[in-house]
Amino acid sequence: MEYVEKELNINGLKPNKGHRALVELEKMGVLKAVITQNIDDLHQVSGNKNVLELHGSLKRWYCLSCGKTGDKNFSCECGGIVRPDVTLYGENLNQDIVNEAVYQLEQADTLIVAGTSLTVYPAAYYLRYFRGKNLIIINDMDTQYDGEATLVIKDNFSYVMDKAVEELKKS
């Protein structure tokens, strides 16, 4: 619990313009899913509906003994140890979420990859399931997939997406 409080503290985090832009894209019907490695719940807080959290969420906790779930202050009646519903180093990802992420990637005609170095596996590996026309990478640094992308934008994701949504609303 001390590690979670100290190292994985998400208190005070708020959605930014990038999160809000994704909500707007979802409302326009052009965004079908958000697949994220983040564990901060900011996509849901901002209003996205179909969020696939590959690494889980610090907002959900569960009992290792009986499986009962609760929030951060959850204390299980069975006396079991509770932990956050996040994938820690060396643990397997939730297969149901992985399967849905793969399905969404296979169905997408455009994939926006943002704010990731694409070096964390197995998440970076899932790009191989994308069969669509447009791979767009928005990142402030180079990635190993830049050469395969239709468009690479080296800038801040929040700024780029805010401007993109602004332009889409004009058309």
Positions of predicted regions on the chain:
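Conserved catalytic core of sirtuin-type NAD+-dependent deacylases
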Residues: 1-171
